Regions:
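Conserved lysine of the Walker
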Residues: 15
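Extreme N-terminal starter segment of soluble prokaryotic enzymes
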Residues: 1-5
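N-terminal phosphate/diphosphate-binding loop that engages ATP/GTP or pyrophosphate donors
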Residues: 20-89
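Phosphate-binding/switch loop-helix module in NTP-utilizing enzymes
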Residues: 81-123
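Hydrophobic anchor at the start of a short beta-strand
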Residues: 33, 111, 140
């Protein structure tokens, strides 16, 4: 099955819960679901899974894949991956993310990938979430909210993703 990438119009909008709900529903249909959150930022401490999001996703999908594969990049500061990596002196390797994804794709029927922030959240200076979605050749689910201004954010996101 083609991977599903769950993105959003903003941060803290519900990507994890949508992704977990999908993982749980697919698992109930006897589909072997892999999960991946290539970038996690903001958690102060790394115990077990790198972030609460990963714990929720792994529990919903009922998987115990290696943490360094499902979350290749973990940054303990609340920022975009690009900013966090720059501040911490870490080099982000997108090829490594793709290798981790391929490993998951080989052992699962489908891989659900949860993004970070919105589609224009920078990963590298000239590479954003939207570029990762294209490189993964994933179908995309956009999570949005009902707050004022969301229609604009949603239309802008859709126009960039060409749906």
């Amino acid at each position: 099955m083609k991977p599903l990438f769950v993105t959003a119009t903003d941060t803290d909008i519900g990507k994890t819960y949508v992704c977990a709900g999908l993982a749980y529903a697919l698992k109930k249909m006897d589909i072997d679901v892999g999960i991946m959150k290539p970038f996690a930022c903001g958690a102060k401490q790394k115990i077990g899974f790198s972030s609460n999001d990963l714990t929720i996703l792994a529990n919903a999908a009922m998987v115990d894949d290696a943490e360094d594969i499902i979350n290749p990049f973990f940054f303990p500061i609340p920022a975009s991956p690009y900013t966090a990596a720059k501040n911490l002196g870490v080099k982000i390797d997108v090829k490594h993310v793709m290798e981790c994804f391929r490993k998951l794709d080989e052992i699962h029927d489908i891989v659900l990938v949860e993004g970070i922030g919105g589609i224009m959240t920078p990963i590298l200076k000239d590479y954003a979430i939207i570029d990762l979605i294209k490189d993964l050749m994933a179908n995309t689910i956009i999570v949005t909210s009902s707050k004022i201004g969301t229609v604009n954010h949603t239309v802008l996101t859709l126009s960039l993703i060409h749906i």
